[in-house]
């Protein structure tokens, strides 16, 4: 079959490979690419040869940092795969990939089961309602336990796994799987070179009873999903393979169940059946139906687009990447319509026209040019100047804005100081390009020191960004120590604070009076309306036109400006609700600027009386350690102001879960290594913001304000 973009959307799968770091996502992707004929030589992450790991840093570190998009073909179906990073610092890559995918393969380590980042990625996939199948990988690993891993999918993720295969053997003796649909054994005995096909055999006698038990569970799940099938099954009739597959597919598309497969990608066992499952059970763009968006002129009005070339164009830009020859690549999911090189489209998010230069389907960092981009597929566009992540591209005659993506604020910052004037100029270019690519990378200028401060999701995230500045943009710079992204908030309401802004300097003056109330604001996620933030809410309670309508947004803007610099140490304020209750204006002297200044000053005065406190990021930390080091590990967590949440056993080791302030976690990897002779490891993800204890807060505030003794 010609390796070209398929127009039959029933045969297209847009999938992601997602997991915890080191569960084997990239290796699984490499094997898929080999078996689908894209790679003649298979790449390994440990030798820096993986196709989807194409950045220099990825090759060096053996982890996937950016989501590489790859197109391949299996059994006359087109599979567009996005290999997403498992490291928590790169959660934005996972988030934006899931937004544009139709299905995903969740890869789990057969020894570890569900790990912290697995939970985080699973939650992100649930947020975007992405159907999933599961692959229990590394079945050849010492301590691998398929049944334990399936149990963790149920217990830790609250998901309903549907076991489709059973392992034959484990660890060094893992030889294959039992296919519970066909009730046959698929074996890859001994050392299996890449490309080895499975041998179909009868089920080993010692596993026959267990296979029959799991087959019955599978059939019961299928029967319970459909009345007709239930009557047939419980009436003693045989269900056909086609009926079983159709029922499973329907449940998967509705995210009711999650089929579970197993194997070892590195040893080339179990990959082909996983590919069959992708085609059999994960949805095509047609299964998911219409895409929703809003009217450009009326955000309350919902518009829909069917996945068809005949519909008006609607597409979402989900990633920007720099290309050494073509400049800016914009990765786009086309939901409806079609587009050709040279066409003009509307960026409805920014209300700007864009012209498409070239169109590509990507194979990691290699490009395959296409003449027409069709609905339902993923492409890279060249030539878009103003489009950034989350923007909608559409037909100017039928504008629509698709749901964008929310990205978390950075939790860690470092100061970066260019070594020469030439480096200063190069740094400006580097920052602009990197910020275009990565919405969680922030840049600000410290007013006091004059330094450029960059922010990100963790130490590794910033390490990689700084490394890219040096490598790709030739910036030489000194990097400061990590800084914690503290926040401030208030603990008590302040009612009816009045402030009058008045200035008379000859001619027309400035006059604005506002009366505001501020209060702590912490709504539950389900209480928020679409588009509302938990960080800040503004309410207008003015009656009788005492503040003209056109000045109300200026008061809101003034308050939001003031929130950027808190009362205690100049950190941004969060979780505040402000209500404009009353005010006064002057026909001649009032203006938008006067009301903006009045709102800002009134808010500052109110915050000073509202018991402001400092907040710090708290990390959810999971430490895996041999039992003999438990005392050391727990003592160290307590010394870091951490709180132990739970202690469990897993695969012969102890698991300590704790909540620890980020400020106490810098350099932890080295400390943990030395305390446990290198035998313990840990992972951490951002959990929440919490109030800093008064004695610690006093030191942070003094240091920030330059009054530390």
UniProtKB/Swiss-Prot annotation:
Any single GO BP term: ribosome disassembly
UniProt entry keywords in alphabetical sequence: Cytoplasm, Elongation factor, GTP-binding, Nucleotide-binding, Protein biosynthesis
Cellular compartments annotated: Cytoplasm
Residues reported to bind GTP: 19-26, 83-87, 137-140
GO cellular component, one term: cytoplasm
Domain of life: Bacteria
Gene Ontology MF term list: GTP binding; GTPase activity; translation elongation factor activity
tr-type G domain boundaries: 10-286
Protein task: Catalyzes the GTP-dependent ribosomal translocation step during translation elongation. During this step, the ribosome changes from the pre-translocational (PRE) to the post-translocational (POST) state as the newly formed A-site-bound peptidyl-tRNA and P-site-bound deacylated tRNA move to the P and E sites, respectively. Catalyzes the coordinated movement of the two tRNA molecules, the mRNA and conformational changes in the ribosome.
Entry's family note: Belongs to the TRAFAC class translation factor GTPase superfamily. Classic translation factor GTPase family. EF-G/EF-2 subfamily.
Name assigned to this protein: Elongation factor G
Species per Swiss-Prot/TrEMBL record: Corynebacterium glutamicum (strain R)
Gene name linked to the record: fusA
């Amino acid at each position: 079959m010609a390796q070209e973009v398929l127009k039959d959307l029933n045969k297209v799968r847009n999938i992601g490979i997602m997991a915890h770091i080191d569960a084997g996502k990239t290796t699984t992707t490499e094997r898929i690419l080999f078996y689908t004929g894209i790679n003649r030589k298979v790449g390994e992450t440990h030798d820096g040869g993986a196709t989807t790991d194409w950045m220099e840093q990825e090759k060096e570190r053996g982890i996937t940092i950016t989501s590489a998009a790859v197109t391949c073909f299996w059994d006359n179906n087109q599979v567009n795969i996005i290999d997403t990073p498992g490291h928590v610092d790169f959660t934005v890559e996972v988030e934006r990939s899931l937004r544009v995918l139709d299905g995903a393969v969740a890869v789990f380590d057969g020894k570890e089961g569900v790990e912290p980042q697995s939970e985080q990625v699973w939650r992100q996939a649930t947020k975007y309602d992405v159907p999933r199948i599961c692959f229990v990988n590394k079945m050849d690993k010492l301590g691998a336990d398929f049944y334990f891993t399936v149990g963790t999918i149920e217990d830790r993720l609250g998901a309903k796994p549907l076991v489709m295969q059973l392992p034959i053997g484990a660890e060094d003796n893992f030889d294959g799987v039992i296919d519970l649909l066909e009730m046959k054994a698929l074996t890859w005995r001994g050392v299996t070179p890449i490309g080895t096909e499975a041998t179909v055999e009868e089920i080993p006698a010692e596993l026959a009873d267990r296979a029959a038990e799991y087959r019955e569970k599978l059939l019961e799940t299928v029967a319970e999903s459909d009345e007709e099938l239930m009557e047939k099954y419980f009436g003693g009739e045989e269900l056909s393979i086609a009926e079983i597959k159709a029922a499973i597919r329907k449940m998967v598309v509705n995210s009711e169940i999650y089929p579970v497969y197993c194997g070892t990608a590195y040893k080339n066992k179990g990959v082909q059946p996983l590919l069959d499952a992708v085609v059999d059970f994960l949805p095509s763009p047609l299964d998911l139906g219409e895409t929703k968006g809003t009217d450009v002129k009326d955000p309350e009005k919902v518009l829909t687009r069917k996945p068809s070339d005949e519909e008006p164009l609607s597409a979402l830009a989900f990633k920007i990447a720099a290309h050494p020859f073509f400049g800016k690549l914009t990765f786009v999911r086309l939901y409806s319509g079609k587009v050709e090189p040279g066409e003009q489209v509307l960026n409805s998010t920014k209300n700007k026209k864009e012209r498409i230069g070239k169109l590509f389907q990507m194979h990691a960092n290699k490009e395959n040019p296409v003449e027409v981009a069709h609905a339902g597929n993923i492409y890279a566009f060249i030539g878009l100047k103003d489009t950034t992540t989350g923007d909608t591209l559409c037909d100017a005659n039928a504008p629509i804005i698709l749901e964008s993506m929310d990205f978390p604020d950075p939790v860690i910052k470092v100061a970066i100081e260019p070594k020469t004037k030439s480096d200063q100029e190069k740094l400006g270019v580097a920052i602009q390009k990197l910020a275009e690519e990565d919405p969680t990378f922030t840049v600000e200028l410290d007013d006091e020191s004059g330094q450029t401060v960059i922010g990100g999701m963790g130490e590794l995230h910033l390490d990689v960004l700084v490394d890219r500045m040096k490598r790709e943009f030739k910036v030489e710079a000194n990097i400061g120590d990590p800084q914690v992204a503290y926040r401030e908030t208030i603990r008590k309401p302040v009612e009816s604070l009045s402030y009058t802004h008045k200035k008379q300097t000859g001619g027309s003056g400035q006059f604005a009076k506002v009366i505001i109330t501020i209060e702590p604001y912490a709504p539950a996620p389900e209480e928020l309306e679409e588009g509302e933030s938990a960080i800040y809410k503004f309410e207008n309670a003015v009656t009788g036109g005492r503040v003209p309508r056109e000045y109300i947004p200026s008061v809101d803007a003034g308050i939001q400006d003031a929130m950027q610099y808190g009362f205690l140490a100049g950190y941004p304020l969060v979780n505040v609700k402000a209500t404009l209750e009353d005010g006064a204006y002057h026909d001649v002297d009032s203006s938008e600027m006067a009301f903006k200044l009045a709102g800002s000053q009134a808010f500052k005065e109110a915050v000073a009386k509202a018991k402001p406190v400092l907040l710090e990021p708290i990390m959810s930390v999971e430490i895996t350690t041999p039992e003999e080091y438990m005392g050391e590990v727990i003592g160290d967590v307590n010394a870091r102001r951490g709180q132990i949440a739970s202690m469990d056993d897993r695969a012969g080791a102890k698991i300590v879960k704790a909540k620890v302030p980020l400020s106490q976690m810098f350099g932890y990897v080295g400390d943990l290594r030395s305390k446990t002779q290198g035998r313990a490891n840990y992972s951490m993800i951002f959990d929440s913001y919490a109030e800093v204890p008064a004695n610690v807060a006093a030191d942070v505030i003094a240091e920030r304000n330059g009054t530390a003794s």
